[in-house]
Amino acid sequence: MNNVLIITGPTASGKSKISIKIAQDNNGVIINCDSKQIYKEIPIITDQPKLNETFIPHKLYGYVSAVKQYSVAEWVNDLKREIYQTFTENKLPIITGGSGMYISSIIYGLSQIPAIEENIRYQTKQLFNTLGNKEFYSLLIEKDPIAKRLHYNNSYQLLRAYEVIEQTGTSIFRLQEELKRKPLFDNFTLCILVPQRQEVYKKINDRFISMINSSVIEEVKNLISLNIPNHFPAMKAHGIPEIIQYLTNKISIEKAIEIAQRNTRHYAKRQYTWFKNQFPNALFYESQDQLLKFISKKFK
């Protein structure tokens, strides 16, 4: 029976490194499920693997233009193609990354909520731009009290929840419960890497300094030159908003580093809680050695 291995966890938890080791030992192919590492214009700021440094096949990295609003459904289609190709080669597909929506779509399947009409999508976006996050959030929970579970800074999910209740009159959360969903694959193993938080926070801080010392500033300058709207997903990758503020003389580089590091640490903190709440039956590992021991037994 074909197996699919999923390695996820908070940002900077070491997912990429351990996935390479597992792939080397198990004739594997690494397939990306990070929603920002898909964009080809921002390999440094999104910490995409340096493919010239490994002989392991990597798929779905840096293959979408940042000028495109790429959906979860599109990614699922691309993922299926790569998975089935891996099966035909008798290799182990190793899906790795930390994007919650991508992981959820694998484990629980895609939502069957009807497509949103273009005029509702446009009106919702205009309203969001006018009100800003907090006021828009307040308006949303008036219409859909269940949406209180969302964070007011998660603009993508706020917009999605508002669009759905505007079009259907029903909460997106209610629809997700009512509409039948099933996993993308029949046989998968979900492993979540959760190192000690202080270890992850230090890696986050060090990684951003390393990016600044490389050519990440030029990378963001090139991104700005494409005149991409600020609400496009690529523009929200961790560190990009802060570097843009620096490049537009709104804050110093020191302040940009401080804010970017703090925001990314806060994101990692939320990820720890989210993974445990969303996937209580997953296999959780604090150390890479623990995970490697399990994999060696599972796939020997």
Swiss-Prot record:
Catalyzed reactions: adenosine(37) in tRNA + dimethylallyl diphosphate = N(6)-dimethylallyladenosine(37) in tRNA + diphosphate
Record keyword tRNA processing present: yes
Record-annotated site: Interaction with substrate tRNA: S99, R121
Protein keywords: ATP-binding, Magnesium, Nucleotide-binding, Transferase, tRNA processing
Cofactor annotation: Mg(2+)
EC number of this enzyme: 2.5.1.75
Entry's Gene Ontology BP terms: tRNA modification
Pfam family, one: IPPT
Gene3D superfamilies assigned: 1.10.20.140, P-loop containing nucleotide triphosphate hydrolases
Binding site for substrate: T11, A12, S13, G14, K15, S16
Function of the protein: Catalyzes the transfer of a dimethylallyl group onto the adenine at position 37 in tRNAs that read codons beginning with uridine, leading to the formation of N6-(dimethylallyl)adenosine (i(6)A).
Quaternary structure (record): Monomer.
Annotated protein name in UniProt: tRNA dimethylallyltransferase
Organism encoding this protein: Ehrlichia ruminantium (strain Welgevonden)
Name of encoding gene: miaA
